Amino acid sequence: MAWNTPKVTEIPLGAEINSYVCGEKK
């Protein structure tokens, strides 16, 4: 799972995606 996103938006975007994916898996 590789996301080609700028470092500036990588942290908030990554956190949002992570929480979404975690919620989907659970």
From Swiss-Prot:
An individual GO BP term: pyrroloquinoline quinone biosynthetic process
Keywords from the UniProt entry: PQQ biosynthesis
Record bears the keyword rRNA processing: no
Cross-link Pyrroloquinoline quinone (Glu-Tyr) mapped to chain: E16-Y20
InterPro entries: PQQ_synth_PqqA
Pathway: Cofactor biosynthesis; pyrroloquinoline quinone biosynthesis
Pfam families for this protein: PqqA (PF08042)
UniProt keyword annotation of Cell division present: no
NCBIfam families assigned: PQQ_syn_pqqA (TIGR02107)
Function in brief: Required for coenzyme pyrroloquinoline quinone (PQQ) biosynthesis. PQQ is probably formed by cross-linking a specific glutamate to a specific tyrosine residue and excising these residues from the peptide.
Family: Belongs to the PqqA family.
Protein name in the entry: Coenzyme PQQ synthesis protein A
